């Protein structure tokens, strides 16, 4: 822990929890060097139970690539304030990392699983050192980019933070395997939800794969309209009508390479961030929406099969008709964590 400052967001939350804006040390997944990361920690008010408050480290979904897109810089934590309320009411300490490069100077290595995983683990460490009533028991929950982050954290936790008692991760609509997206370069078959993410995806991946040149792939209104480009690469502000309009001007055939090597470089970049990286240190819930148009449930299932082959304990749930980051998945994820904290044996359908 490098620093913390009081954080007050809403009267109803202030009544049940104490908030902290934190800066803490973590590790780069690409270089192995120390990094500074920001985030938030909330602890329940009152006396902790005898065994201490368990900790939940949250991996947030895609918010953007710039410092101002950090969860900790938004008064509603970019929508995560509701989750903080829910979890602290259960008597849990909550930590939300901003991830490396968000909230602090420097590029954000978007979807780099090792960096995100280290950030999630170290947020739990920071919470434990900051909150006197916390226990060493912790779990993780995340969705989309955050689901990838918490899955990676589950794999890293045992060796990276052996002093903590990791009980599992709930990975919701995780960006665990996007390699199929490379097969659509130039063929015009991207779904609208995938189109909306392509500027962020290509630009973010280029941080750790410099040979991937976003300008070789991004054409049409992205290239021709500076205002659209700024909106598409800006913070993801929910249902922002201006950004939605810019997305509406994208066309599937706007995304294609200009050199023979471009598609292969993109494919390698996506393969590099695919999970699993190795066996997990604890059980996992993996939830996917059967109608998810951004991250196909079949892609997630392929990653689960590989994790099962490594000996992981995984409960996979595919919800028919549900889309990306469905509220039902979040409800199931929170209950799954409650069961792990209660010592109930984790289910598996590997």
Annotate each predicted stretch with a short phrase.
Residues 1-48:
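Catalytic-loop region of hydrolases
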Residues 9, 175-276:
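Accessory cap/linker subdomain of secreted extracellular hydrolases
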Residues 29-89:
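Short, surface-exposed "cap/lid" segments of acyl-processing enzymes
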Residues 57-59, 99, 319:
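Alpha/beta-hydrolase
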Residues 110-131:
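Alpha/beta-hydrolase active-site loop
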Residues 125-196:
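Primarily recognizes the serine-hydrolase "nucleophile elbow" in alpha/beta-hydrolase
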Residues 258-268, 294, 301-350:
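C-terminal catalytic histidine-bearing segment of alpha/beta-hydrolase fold enzymes
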Residues 280, 285-292:
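Short beta-strand/loop motif that positions the catalytic acidic residue
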